[in-house]
């Protein structure tokens, strides 16, 4: 079976250095991939590159489309939903329901269809009580959940999640994890919280020096409950 997403020898340069250096990656349908790395190593750049928001060399293929121009990437962004680190970058409509309906409207649904879909989704996610709220007045945790609802409303095949649980309190964290765990679609998740990644993902890679290293998140329960990371192959292996 062909992967949903495939990157082949993709490079992104910034200030004279390669942030991504002839990097290759594939993501299968339903697969949940943890993307791990130090601050500033290029994890966000990689997510942005997948959806055409960073100029890059190499080959990006998604959903059977070999992406060569902005028109191609617009088609990709309808199927690969990107959740930004900062929900304020994603939410710009007056009310929650307007923010959630924005994507479906852009995909061609009528106003009535978009509102019905968005209200139903908010209800299913346990967020129906927020529908009429002014987005600007929400708490940080509520904004993050609403931004997730907004990308899910586009009914994507892949979620690209950039620090989705960062700075959430316990209540909103558990709600976020419950929502993500219930999704049956592929994901790439960037997070510094290995405990969260172990719960949500089934494969891990580490971004270092512009390359991806295959890795494994696990715990040795007989010694420690703390999740830790193992590199499992040599650098340069096909991913």
Swiss-Prot record:
SMART domains: AAA
Protein name, per record: Putative ABC transporter ATP-binding protein BAB1_1388
PROSITE patterns named in the record: ABC_TRANSPORTER_1, ABC_TRANSPORTER_2
Any one annotated GO CC term: ATP-binding cassette (ABC) transporter complex
Subcellular location(s) of the protein: Cell inner membrane
Positions with a binding annotation for ATP: 37-44
Residues in ABC transporter domain copies: 5-234
Residues spanning the signal sequence: none
Family: Belongs to the ABC transporter superfamily.
Gene3D superfamilies: P-loop containing nucleotide triphosphate hydrolases
Keywords: ATP-binding, Cell inner membrane, Cell membrane, Membrane, Nucleotide-binding, Translocase, Transport
Top-level EC class: translocase
Described purpose of this protein according to its UniProt entry: Probably part of an ABC transporter complex. Responsible for energy coupling to the transport system.
Record membrane topology: Peripheral membrane protein
Organism superkingdom: Bacteria
GO function terms (MF aspect): ATP binding; ATP hydrolysis activity; ATPase-coupled transmembrane transporter activity
EC numbers, comma separated: 7.-.-.-
């Amino acid at each position: 079976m062909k992967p949903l997403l495939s990157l082949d020898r993709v490079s992104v340069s910034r200030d004279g250095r390669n942030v991504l250096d002839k990097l290759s990656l594939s993501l299968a349908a339903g697969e949940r991939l943890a993307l791990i790395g130090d601050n500033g190593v290029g994890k966000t750049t990689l997510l942005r590159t997948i959806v055409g928001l960073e100029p890059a060399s190499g080959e990006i293929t998604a959903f059977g489309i070999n992406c060569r121009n902005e028109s191609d990437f617009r088609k990709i962004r309808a199927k690969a939903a990107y959740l930004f680190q900062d929900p304020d970058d994603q939410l710009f409509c007056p009310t929650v329901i307007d923010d959630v309906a924005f994507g479906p409207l852009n995909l061609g649904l009528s106003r009535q269809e978009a509102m019905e879909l968005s209200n139903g989704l908010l209800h299913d996610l346990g967020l129906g009580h927020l529908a009429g709220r002014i987005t600007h007045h929400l708490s940080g945790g509520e904004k993050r959940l609403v931004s997730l609802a907004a990308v899910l409303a586009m009914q994507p095949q892949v979620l690209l999640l950039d620090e989705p649980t960062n700075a959430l309190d316990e209540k909103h964290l558990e709600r976020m994890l419950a929502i993500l765990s219930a999704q049956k679609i592929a994901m790439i998740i960037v997070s510094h919280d290995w405990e969260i990644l172990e719960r949500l993902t089934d494969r891990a890679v580490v971004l270092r020096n512009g390359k991806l290293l295959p890795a494994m998140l696990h715990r040795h329960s007989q010694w420690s409950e703390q999740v830790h990371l193992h590199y499992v192959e040599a650098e340069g292996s096909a991913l």
